[in-house]
Amino acid sequence: MAAAAATAPAAAVVRRMKLGSQGMEVSAQGLGCMGMSAVYGERKPEADMVALVRHAVAAGVTFLDTSDVYGPHTNEVLVGKAVAAAAATEEEVQVQVATKFGITPAWEVRGDPAYVRAACEGSLRRLGVGCIDLYYQHRIDSTVPVEITMGELKKLVEEGKIKYIGLSEASASTIRRAHVVHPITAVQIEWSLWSRDVEEDIVPTCRELGIGIVAYSPLGRGFFSSGAKLVDELPDDDFRKSLPRFQPENLEKNAAIFEKVNAMAARKGCTSSQLALAWVHHQGSDVCPIPGTTKIHNFDQNVGALSVKLTPDEMSELESYASADVVQGDRYHGTFLNTWKNSETPPLSSWRSGN
C-alpha cells in the first residue's frame, strides 16, 4: 500500500515550546533547511525555497535550521533571504534561526577558538543578522578540549553575536563538560523510530541538565515517507545512497519496518511520515523535531503530524517494528565525520595557550 493512500489529518496549530531552560522559545516543530541547498541532490531553485520558508513561517513553523557547511555557505544565504522576505510580510512573527559551525568546506572538523570566531562572523554576514539565535557546534573537534571551544562561544554570547549555545552529535560526558563553561540550550541529535541509541545516555543527560532536545532526521532521512522505493527515486549524487541503511542488502530487510508502520498509519487515517513524526513528538514536551523538505505539500503533511495522537500501546507497537535488533545498517559509514560516539575531547589540562 502506498504511503500516500491514507488521508492526512488537517493541518494543526503549531504550538510554541520552551527549548531548554535558558529562555529560548521556538515553534514545537522546526524546518530543516539542509536539503534545499546541499547533500540531497542538486540545489533547489532559490525562489521556490524562499516561498517554502515564507509558507512555513506563515503556518507557524518559525524555527529554521541551517549550517555553514550546507552548500557550503549557500544555505545560510538562502535562509537569510527567506527570513527577510518573511519579515516583510509577517511583521509580528518572530523567526528563530539556528545555524552551526565546526565542519569546514573540506569536511574537516575544527573547534579551535580562531576558527569558532571566524565561522560565527561568516554566518552573521551570510544570514544578514546581527545576532544568531542558536549557534551549534555541528561536530565535536576531538583534538580540542570542549572547554576551549565553549570559552570562545561564551565570549561571542557576551559580545551579543549569539544568543544561545547548542551542541550537535555530542556524547553525554562532552555535554556535561561544555555545560559547566556556559549553559547549553539545546543538543541536536538524530532521533527517529530507527535511530534510538541516544535514549540510553544522551537524552537522560539533557533532561537532567535542563537542555532542550532537537531531533534531526526524524523521518529516517525520508525512509518513513516512502520506504525502500525512496532510493530508486534519488539522484546519483544524493548523500543517502552512500549510507549503510540504504544499501541493497540492508534496505531489503528494512523495507519490512516501513510496511508495518505504513499499515498502522492506514488504520489511524494518517500517512506513514506523520505517524513516524508523531512518535518523535510524543517523546516529550522538551523535544523539537526538525523535519526537512523542499516541497510545500510535504511541509503541510509534516505539520499535520501534530494532530496525530498515539496511545502508550501504539507507541510500544511502533517501537517494536524498529527495535535495534531489527534495523539493519548503521546511521553513517565508518569514515564519516565524528558522531557522538567518538566526540570525546582531551582534558583541559592538556591545552596550552597558542595551540
Curated annotation (Swiss-Prot):
Family: Belongs to the aldo/keto reductase family.
Residues annotated for substrate binding in this entry: H138
EC number of the protein: 1.1.1.-
Molecular function GO labels: aldo-keto reductase (NADPH) activity
Pfam families assigned to the protein according to its UniProt record, in alphabetical order: Aldo_ket_red
Residue sites binding NADP(+) per the record: S217, P218, L219, G220, R221, G222, F223, F224, S225, S226, G227
InterPro entries cross-referenced by the UniProt entry: Aldo-Keto_reductase, NADP_OxRdtase_dom, NADP_OxRdtase_dom_sf
Matches recorded under PANTHER family: AFLATOXIN B1 ALDEHYDE REDUCTASE, ALDO-KETO REDUCTASE 3-RELATED
Catalytic residue list: Y70 (proton donor)
Keywords of the record: NADP, Oxidoreductase
Name this protein carries in UniProt: Probable aldo-keto reductase 3
GO cellular component, one term: cytoplasm
